[in-house]
Each structure stands twice: as C-alpha cells, then as structure tokens.
Amino acid sequence: MIYKVLYQKDQIVNPRRETTKTLFLEADNVVAARTMVEDNTPYNIELIQELTGNSLAYEKQNPDFKLTTFKSEDK
C-alpha cells in the first residue's frame, strides 16, 4: 500500500502548517509506515494517510510524486 506522510523536519519546533512537508512510501500497513519513518529520520510525523483509488491517482499527477525508500528496508 502507498502512504502519504505529513511531517515537520524536526521534533523540536512546534508544528506549523506552513512548514509541513510530505513524503510517500510503500508499506504493508500504517504501523510499518510509521516505524520506517521514525527509524530512519528525525521527523515529527503529523499524519499518515493510506492512498488508494482516486486519491492515489491524483497524487501521482503531481510532478513531485516519488516513493521514498530507506536503506534499512533492504534487510
């Protein structure tokens, strides 16, 4: 499944909508997606949303859409 993760770059600064970033990743479930991000980044996760159907098709139209992979996934 593909997940959209909304996050802040670090956990020190309070979250602000204006500084929220997005990444997309493939994981078996939302818990696995959260674990991947937490284990490989210092990000403050705001929301993890599963993308399917029209939502996924819409996101794929964005030229910045790309799946993020982490080296620890290669175990």
Swiss-Prot record:
Protein role: A non-essential component of RNA polymerase (RNAP).
Class of enzymatic activity (EC top level): transferase
Family: Belongs to the RNA polymerase subunit epsilon family.
Protein EC: 2.7.7.6
Swiss-Prot/TrEMBL keywords: DNA-directed RNA polymerase, Nucleotidyltransferase, Transcription, Transferase
Cited InterPro entries: RpoY
Catalytically driven reaction(s): RNA(n) + a ribonucleoside 5'-triphosphate = RNA(n+1) + diphosphate
Gene Ontology MF terms in the entry: DNA binding; DNA-directed RNA polymerase activity
GO biological process: DNA-templated transcription
Subunit structure: RNAP is composed of a core of 2 alpha, a beta and a beta' subunit. The core is associated with a delta subunit, and at least one of epsilon or omega. When a sigma factor is associated with the core the holoenzyme is formed, which can initiate transcription.
Source species, domain of life: Bacteria
GO CC annotations on file: DNA-directed RNA polymerase complex
Entries under NCBIfam families matching the protein: PRK13667.1
Protein name from the UniProt record: DNA-directed RNA polymerase subunit epsilon
Signal peptide: none
Alphabetized Gene3D superfamilies for the sequence: RNAP, epsilon subunit-like
